[in-house]
Amino acid sequence: MSQTTTLILLPQTTYDGGGNANVYTVIGNSQPAAAYYLGNRDLQTVNINLTQVTGNIVIEASLATTPTSTDWFKVYELEANINAAANSAPLIASNASVYTNINGNFVAMRAKVVNFAHGVVNFTKLSY
């Protein structure tokens, strides 16, 4: 069965800490996950597109229909660092378009950028 629903977890987000070590966290809006509309569906695909990013992209899920701040838990994390060692995973991720399949009977999902210091998160999308 092909995926028919695509939602934006985090729209294009740009930040340049100006080289003075200012970092912050960006939290995207809650979106319904596969189980919200489709009952026992448990496969979601997350697509992340980054340009020169230093920060951690965190995908969180919830089992609550109307999640509060304490209902969220981490299901995936991508570490990106434009200043990392050559050919390291964080350096490669800093300019990447990646996807990952996330299994789980989740009701809601969201994306966060933690320790965001630099770069452009072009998009973070959820499909099911």
Predicted feature residues:
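Short, intrinsically disordered N-terminal pre-domain segments
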Residues: 1-20, 123-128
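Serine/threonine-rich, low-complexity intrinsically disordered segments
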Residues: 7-8, 15, 27, 56, ...
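Residue-level detector of short, conserved catalytic/binding motifs and their immediate flanks
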Residues: 44, 57, 109
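Short edge beta-strand/loop segments characteristic of extracellular beta-sandwich folds
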Residues: 47-49
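Short, surface-exposed beta-strand/strand-loop-strand elements in extracellular ectodomains
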Residues: 54-77, 122-128
